[in-house]
Amino acid sequence: MLINQSFEIDSCDDVELGIKRTSKLEYRISYDDEKEIKAIVFIIGGYGANANIYFLDSYRNYIAKNFDVVAVHVFYHCFCQRRSDVEKYSTLADFTKDDLKLIEKVLRKYNIPCDQLANNTVVSHCEYLSEIMTELKMLNRLPYDFEERLTATFIPSRGEYQNFGIMAAIDHINALKDLVKRFPKLADLPKIYGGGSYGGYLALLIAKIAPWYVDGVIDNSGSAVPPLNYIIGRELEFKSKDTNGDMYMQGDHFFVSCFLKTHWTRKENSPYFFNNENYFIRTLLNKDHLILQSQKNKNIIYVSYHSKEDPLTPANFKQQTMQILKILGYDVSLNLIDENKIDGKFIKNLDHGCGIPDKALFRKELPLMLEKLQGRKSLMQENSISYPCGNKVFIFKDVGDKFELVIKD
């Protein structure tokens, strides 16, 4: 019989920024209690995974039922990054002071009064802006394809914000530790982490911060270096719609670059300054760090897909990372996708993610990984790992029932 369960636990605070976490960590599991369980499999959703919770539950059930595993979804810190079909997990689109400042600047270009501009009047102001721009284009006073750029902010639920990577990765290990405490018979099973885009990045990052709790990684298009547009994108020079912020919404004569709420900034006098060490710890393409990881566990199987033409996360960084892992003795399979590998079924395009849904990714790669891991005992043994990053040392370690980050000068 297929069993579905949900748990809420305490996890980690934001150690980097000194912010106390107020939300609980939720994770959901699915398993068939009539079958012999082969592994613990974490299905890691990327940006937008919260949009359809029913769909999320259904393909977790599919994986648990078809592959005899405990399938786990962790609703990690800042999991709620988009509008959701379940209000509890929905983000709110809003306009911050920075957004309103830019909108006002654009409106004044067209002599539109701004004395009534506020969060609840932005839409009506933009409708008026669209009317004026339509008229100017009809009069050939604006190029027909000209667009203005506006900005908006996504406010995640549960009082969360975009920390990017570290807290979300720690959440998965805390969920694992809670899971095996509740179900001790699962403790020695192989542990597999996988997902696409940000989910793939988190799977790779988990292998970095807690390699002794990882047996396999299934990655599709995870970034080997942190994409800064998702962290401090608001402060970066604008280059294109696709690389500015988290996403954009298209209007008739303007588009809206959307940014997830974050505390990170490049303002050096801020307590939330995103410094070099914060970048280094999130970077997977770091030879010295990969050597330290390999000293803790070389028995991780890596399977990765990446488009050679990926416009968001350059393939050459992933290629270099996987080459180093292979030299260090890891079992690595990197599938670099070019136009000859597009089959219209599994691989649909050369865009970011290659058009591969998570369900299809696991359906193809999970049986092969389970076969390789058959009979492996993966013991839950406490450990720690230290990564020098500039003037800081990031220490990830087990502390009783918890997994924690400590930063030392």
Give the role of each language-model region.
Residues 208-276:
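Hydrolase active-site cap/lid region
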Residues 93-183:
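Alpha/beta-hydrolase active-site loop
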Residues 66-87, 145-152:
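Conserved alpha/beta-hydrolase
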Residues 37-47:
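Short beta-strand element of the alpha/beta-hydrolase
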Residues 46-55, 63-66, 79-82, 226-227, ...:
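Short substrate-entry loop that stabilizes the transition state in hydrolases
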Residues 35, 245-409:
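Serine-hydrolase catalytic core
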Residues 54-74, 93, 142-145, 214:
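Short amphipathic alpha-helix adjacent to the substrate-entry channel of hydrolases
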Residues 1-39, 100, 160:
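N-terminal cap/lid segment of alpha/beta-hydrolase-fold proteins
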